Amino acid sequence: MAGERHGGMLGLQKRGALQSRRAAAREGTTMILNGPGFSYTEPDIGAEFVPPIPEHPREAIVKLCEHCTNRLLHRDELLGYEYWSFAEAATDEQAEVLCKMKMRRPYTLPEMVKLTGMPEADIEKMLDDMSYTGLLEYNWENPERAKQWVLPMLVPGSAEFLNMRVSQLEEHPVYAKFFEQASKGPLSKATPMVPPGGAGIGMHVIPVEKAIDAASTSVPIEHIEHWLDKYEGKYAASTCSCRASRRVMGEGCADDPADWCIAVGDMADYVVETDRGHYVTRDEVYDILRQAEDNGFVHQITNIDGENKIFAICNCNVNVCYALRTSQLFNTPNLSRSAYVAKVEKDKCVACGRCVEVCPAGAAKLGQKLCSKKAGGRVPEYPRQELPDATKWDHTKWSPNYRNDNRIETHESGTAPCKTACPAHVAVQGYLKLAAQGRYDEALALIKRENPLPAICGRVCNRRCEDACTRGRVDAAVAIDEVKKFIAQRDLDAATRYVPPVVTPTRAGGFDQKIAIIGAGPAGLSCAFYLAEKGYKPVVFEKNERPGGMLTYGIPSFKLQKDVIEAEVEVIRLMGAEFRYGVEVGRDVTLDELRAQGFKAFYVAIGCQGGRLAGIPGEDAEDVTVAVDFLREVNSGKVDALPGRTIVVGGGNVAIDVARNACRLGSEHVEMFCLESEAQMPASVEERREAIEDGAHISCGWGPKEVHLDEAGRVCGITFKRCTRVMDDEGRFAPEYDESDLRRVDADRVVMSIGQSIVWGDLLAGSKVGLGRGQGALADPQTYQTAEPDIFVGGDVYTGPSFAIDAIAAGHEAAVSIHRFVQPGSTLTIGRNQRRYAALDRDDAVIESYDNASREVAHVDREREKAAPFSEYVETFTEEQVRAETARCLGCGASIVDPNKCIGCGLCTTKCAFDAIHLDRDRPECSTMVKYEQKLPSLGKYALKRAIKIKFGRK
């Protein structure tokens, strides 16, 4: 009816209907931003919340739209999201009152009585009702401290207020669309004309306090402390309207929106009295700021009232923040940036990537420190972002994909090859430097940023970082893995182990969504680690009685002692993960039963627990087994001796493990037969050498033809046929044989190590999870989400048999996806680190001076090996060896900051452990704060300067 609000978008707020409408809207709906002389099309998020404008719209609401919007571009059109937002927020009578109020002019109660002619009690109630809704704000900013009401601008203003109370937003989701557009559309043409300081528009970045506390040239308004002093005792924490809005539209960042924004002064009273927040102490404000910095959130202050007033300090996630979007989408940093610019001291920088990962603007990227031949023997110059200051600017200069583009970590020309080659992208150069300085705790913490199992990997990793090491072009690669093993030994001692702190994007201390991880192998353990670090209490279901998967039941204990696994699992347990052993999901409990228990997401990482046979006669005999079963029996302590002759079929690292175990269990003859030539063998050269040292023989170029049995049905031998080719011309596995060239060998047992299989059992019964080649689960390659939305997969069940470090990397990414999945309205893809690393060209690098020391080698204790053949016998580096080896690192990489993109937030300085990045006050003009009412003069003055530069080509 004409005088009433339309509640809840005609009932469309019901979540099921919204989800289906959201999916339909995203399928193909676009919207057009229109302004004088331009048109720009983009996905129309939130379109499902905006019904068509009625044939006969409410006249009072149409007038209110005209009164509160259409101010800069003077549009003639009536936009649906504006109309419906005001229609749901205001009665016609309220709209008429609002249209009588001038924007940003305060009115006391007597003034409102005079303005409207309404009785005092009636108008006061209406004003309070509209304040509660968010159409008005109020303060006491007058000499008499009399309450006065203000019709705020839309942004920052009523658009935020409409989104700040979650219950109201859920009832009226069109408010989310309104806020999203009100903070973008009106600015789309004006942004290139915005001068340094922001011209009284929106928000302004204020640096991390400790990043500028020593800056002698700073001015008070650049310090958070200045504003906290100014509003001492008047603080309130409130819901972040940007996070709430984006979440409703399905583009949330998985942050809990509550309590990230800090209202100050009279605004604190407003948000508390209108149920948008609660009072906090100064110490609580500090805690919010600290936690925001830990999470990589940008501090911003309101910038519409000049240099003597703000009303909020926000802690913003660039993936959802509409204020930061103004500078990032339009590539116009004047709308955000502070007076400061980050600068890197390359001599100190070790390309750890911490500053890159946290930079909201994509200003910091990894590059190289080594000189380049192509650059004339100098360090390469890196491109800078073009700016609108002296350039014509339209939508072709915008960055609509900025949330992902800003998360690309590396310049195209590349960075340190070790970090690039590592599947987990561990900061190798960084932890080598920390180890060189004796800062072992910090080195371990840095490693665990990407690898929660460094003690394990220090023993079993296939060392792709070393294969890529630039030092290998000089003499021998740095012994990276041995240094990592030395550092990670600290995890084996409760007194020195590193248990990471929880860094969670919620002020509630953690998240209560239940997440099930199925399988306690490296992928599952990694996922559990990073979910626990994010504030969850994941539950790990493991069908065996011990954790580790193939780490425990596949890798020989003389390579990886099981107490190492237990020590690193204990860290994950201390972080809050729960382990339930002896539970096979699908048999003992189903996924549906776990859902009924409240589990919201599942990470399936059960590995490849089965083996494969060759399909030849005689292989079904009792003494023929597959490698994974053989290794499981040995590692479970069920095999004490293995007399006689053991023949191993296969040439990979698993086959090597079988052969070495057989040698140590007393087999009088152990021989491996593989299809490949010696040069083609999958097993590494080092692994082959160790097997031969143990007494194994290796015969290359043979494939199994038949297993021979004696009269009792027991294995007595096996015949092989000559393999003439393993791969076809396309590189596909297609072995060919010479059937006339045969070789028979005696055998008491045969172990097939020619592949592994996935044993699903009933785990996926009734699910939509698709299976591909080799029965591996099908999933999105970035998010690891399957066709069953709450099921994610990783490790060998997705890739097939691979290495522990690959599974660890996958588990980390799955944790990111699962965190986003279980948080309402979050996107799984937008704004996550892209993991797009590129290695510098080692052939182009100029290497002139370096430490001439040779590569250190870990001591092998042969006496211990003889006395205890199933105990580790390769010793850890000494501290002296670590110092010598880390000195061999060439320090290939460094972070590069583009000053044109830097917004001066200072977050990079909070992450650097090397004091290599600082803020310099290079742009003092960016601290020019003016009132909103000075916007047009400020824009006009700067636009004139800019036009002159463009016309005459000045910079």
Q: Where does each model-flagged region fall?
A:
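A short, conserved structural fragment
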Residues: 131-142, 364-365, 917
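A Rossmann-like FAD-binding core segment of flavoenzymes
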Residues: 563-612, 625-642, 664-774
